[in-house]
């Protein structure tokens, strides 16, 4: 499933590692992390997985350095290395997948493969015994990277 084809482009796997517990990481996410020689991510998320992948090279950035983190992942892939960029929850739900696709334009020789994960919303709902049903919607209330006025308008 995650095997590189002969002549394939260099790749960055944007990997959702789930809401935090090892048992909440998908098999596909684990396979990508095993396959890649470089794992990039937010320092806190790297700390969650570092002990399981001690033979890897880790690249970290602090909060609010998301664009820099993406560029680091692309630059490592350009060197011919398989790279995982990890995010909590699902890579496409408040994760790094969107930003990676935006920045990819500057790195046409690198392919992006998104590996989905269990979202914090669905993981939390399961813990609480509160299924998300009937027109479920998610709106982030974090104003760390989005102005509050934009959040209120949503």
Protein language model features and the residues they cover:
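Class I S-adenosyl-L-methionine
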Residues: 2-113, 118, 123
């Amino acid at each position: 499933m995650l095997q590189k084809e002969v002549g394939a482009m260099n790749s960055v796997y944007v990997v959702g590692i789930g809401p935090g517990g090892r048992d909440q990481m998908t098999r596909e996410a684990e396979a990508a992390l095993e396959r890649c020689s470089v794992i990039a991510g937010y320092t806190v998320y790297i700390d969650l997985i570092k002990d399981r992948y001690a033979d890897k090279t880790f690249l970290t950035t602090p909060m609010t350095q998301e664009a820099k983190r993406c560029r680091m992942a692309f630059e490592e892939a350009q060197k011919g290395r398989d790279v995982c960029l990890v995010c909590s929850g699902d890579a496409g739900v408040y994760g790094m997948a969107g930003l990676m696709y935006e920045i990819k334009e500057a790195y046409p020789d690198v392919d992006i493969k998104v590996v989905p994960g269990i979202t914090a919303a669905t993981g939390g709902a399961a813990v609480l015994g509160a299924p998300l049903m009937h027109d479920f919607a998610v709106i982030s209330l974090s104003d760390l990277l989005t102005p509050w006025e934009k959040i209120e308008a949503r």
